[in-house]
A protein has these predicted regions:
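Short, acidic, metal-binding catalytic loop of nucleotide-sugar glycosyltransferases
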Residues: 2, 14, 20-33
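Hydrophobic targeting segments
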Residues: 3-9, 25, 35-38, 56
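Active-site beta-to-alpha loop of glycosyltransferases that engages the nucleotide-sugar donor
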Residues: 9-20, 42-44
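Loop/turn elements at helix/coil->beta-strand transitions in domains of secreted/extracellular proteins
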Residues: 32-35, 68-71
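Residue-level recognition of beta-strand->loop/alpha-helix junctions
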Residues: 38-40, 152
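Acidic ATP/Mg2+-coordinating residue in the GHKL
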Residues: 40-43, 78
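Conserved catalytic core of nucleotide-sugar-dependent glycosyltransferases
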Residues: 48-52, 57, 65-66, 72-200
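C-terminal catalytic/acceptor-binding lobe
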Residues: 135-276
């Protein structure tokens, strides 16, 4: 049976967050026809979020070749989840892109898009080591004439207490040459140029799979590890240096190690995590 919703959740080095996600979301989605695919980049290269999400789509297309164009893809960060059923109406339709959590200048965080539409715009750019892929996705959707739906939307800088938030570090590798290239342009880089893709599928349950990606080649693979790639802090300001928990500024994220910091009102913690 073809699911109506397929969640594509990219991750690497996020085992605690993945554990929370796979415990919470089945309860949230128990009334839906859904599938969750964790797409795990398993090599030693910098994380390529755009390519990893594109590979999730490629797997969906291969698995459901006759029906994939009518599936709603939910591009979902592993660090954020709804608190309760029907908080987000994930299902969308052709030419409508739903944005539930994130920032309005991008299409990142939690986004629903028709799989046929995602293919039409060639998915995300395959950008190594930086998060610009969400900005480019927004531009591609605008050019295609898709309608953004933020009728239920929580802003990442203001409304983090309205969703389950699992904090992690903010350090990323940024390649300035690639940033300049993708600020300029086209739909050429995306799903269509990925090649030499190798992966295995781990079926964790009827509704949850892990796609372990061990290799893929993009148009920019030759730039990985180049000298102009520098370690920077993508949100360098006093709050994120000193630690900030949304209210009391008493969580130092640089000391949290691999464990996620959960920003959850106490009144909701017991009901959400009683099954963990």
């Amino acid at each position: 049976m073809t699911p109506e919703l397929i969640f594509i959740v990219p991750y690497r080095n996020r085992a605690p967050q993945k554990k929370v996600f796979e415990c919470v979301m089945p309860t949230i989605l128990e009334d839906e026809k859904y599938k969750i695919i964790f797409v795990h980049q398993k090599d030693n290269r910098p994380f390529n979020r755009g390519a990893i999400k594109n590979l999730g789509f490629i797997y969906v297309r291969k698995t459901y070749p006759e029906t994939y164009k009518n599936i709603t893809l939910v591009l979902h960060d592993i660090d954020f989840m709804p608190y309760y059923k029907n908080q987000f109406k994930y299902k969308t339709k052709q030419n409508v892109v739903k944005h539930f959590f994130g920032y309005t200048n991008t299409l990142g965080g939690i986004v629903s898009i028709n799989a046929g539409d995602f293919e039409k715009i060639n998915g995300f750019p395959n950008i190594w080591s930086w998060g610009l892929e969400d900005n480019v996705l927004k531009r591609r959707c605008q050019v295609a004439g898709f309608v953004p739906d933020r009728s239920t939307f929580y802003h990442g800088g203001v409304d983090e207490d309205k969703v389950i938030t699992l904090w992690h570090g903010w350090d990323r590798l940024i390649n300035p040459k690639i940033k300049r290239k993708f600020t300029a342009t086209t739909n050429l880089d995306g799903i269509k140029i990925l090649k030499n893709v190798n992966y295995t599928i781990e079926e964790q349950s009827e509704n949850i799979s892990v796609m372990h990606v061990t290799n893929f080649i993009t148009g920019e693979s030759h730039l990985v590890g180049s000298q102009d790639t520098k370690l920077r802090n993508s949100r360098e300001n006093k709050f994120f240096k000193d630690g900030y928990d949304g209210k009391n500024q008493n969580v130092n994220r640089r000391q949290t190690g691999l464990l996620p910091v959960m920003i959850i009102p106490k009144r909701r913690q017991r009901s959400i995590f009683k099954g963990l």
